[in-house]
Amino acid sequence: MRGGSLWQLGQSITRRLAQSDKKVVSRRYFASEADLKKTALYDFHVAHGGKMVPFAGWSMPIQYKDSIMDSTVNCRENGSLFDVAHMCGLSLKGKDCVPFLETLVVADVAGLAPGTGSLTVFTNEKGGAIDDSVITKVTDEHIYLVVNAGCRDKDLAHIEEHMKAFKSKGGDVSWHIHDERSLLALQGPLAAPVLQHLTKEDLSKLYFGNFQILDINGSTCFLTRTGYTGEDGFEISVPDEHAVDLAKAILEKSEGKVRLTGLGARDSLRLEAGLCLYGNDMEQHISPVEAGLTWAIGKRRRAEGGFLGADVILQQLKDGPTIRRVGFFSSGPPARSHSEVHDESGNKIGEITSGGFSPNLKKNIAMGYVKSGQHKTGTKVKILVRGKPYEGSITKMPFVATKYYKPT
């Protein structure tokens, strides 16, 4: 596909992200063009042809000169460099930082070895998801975590409220929000070999989910082997004043194969990887069990509870949820958020939460929720797009096999 079809695809994704952003902003805070925050790489994006759009109160590149489709494919074939500094990195410190965090998330934080991490979910009293987050135990008295841009204000207020209560009972915990640092995501098969050129540390011993503080390109960085694409890769927390130099060095060392990539391709990549987007696929009324994130609930936490909404979540683990997140293949136009899912008799059984055309599979994919009992792989469904039903089927996720770097 070339020319007009690709342009239409890009415009469709652009509109979808912009509409999603408007929904998020209207719920959480309003920002005019003049109020939009800019990352340390803003001028760098503009100089490289970045198309800047409002996203969660920030001016962020949705794409560059490459089409969204080409950028998505290039990430899986070579590599992509994303600016994700709109997300919020923070550190919790103190001898009680681990038990404090365990009151708010479902992960077995105490069971993590220093230098390792995991995806987790912040929950509310009803068992719903406040946000998902990648957390890392740097040491037994230092936790580093990253929360979503659109949830920043809500998450920080939530953490602060519970921290005050925890400290009032004698708990030793403090926090620091890393507003002085940028966050870059280097993803794809060339991520490790390119980054290895910029550090003396042996990255072959740093596996998926591992964390290290090290020198990269002459700057002290927080490096986590993780990402939002399903590919091998890294998230690099770098001081703001060194962010542009690091981005330039990564692009130069790749000899043009790793390309700057925007939010449009990032959305396609995470959808292909079957990963949730908070605000679409996860919300405050959806539990980790319903979202298919049971694996993120630590075994010890299932036995002991101790986090907000534990009674609801542990009951769902016992009885099973009433709805389940599943993947879909569909015919016709790509299904979008809020498209209804019907069974073959025309009864509504669920709803799409994310969908689009997969540049790597060359077919429509989507994820959403259906009633338990209707979630089996291979189940035939009808997906309504602009009121018209199209053939679809339920499938397992991820749609594209993940390539996380793990010990053999």
From Swiss-Prot:
Gene symbol of the encoding locus: GDCST
Residues annotated to bind substrate: 235, 266, 404
Record's keyword annotation contains Repeat: no
Pfam family, any one: GCV_T_C
Location of this chain's protein in the cell: Mitochondrion
Gene Ontology MF terms: aminomethyltransferase activity; mRNA binding; transaminase activity
Keywords: Aminotransferase, Mitochondrion, Transferase, Transit peptide
Protein name from the UniProt record: Aminomethyltransferase, mitochondrial
InterPro entries according to UniProt: GCS_T (IPR006223), GCST_C (IPR013977), GCV_T_N (IPR006222), GcvT/YgfZ/DmdA (IPR028896), GcvT/YgfZ_C (IPR029043), TrmE/GcvT_dom1 (IPR027266)
EC number: 2.1.2.10
CC terms in the record's Gene Ontology section: apoplast; chloroplast; chloroplast envelope; chloroplast stroma; chloroplast thylakoid; cytosolic ribosome; extracellular region; glycine cleavage complex
Gene Ontology biological-process entries: glycine catabolic process
Main location: mitochondrion
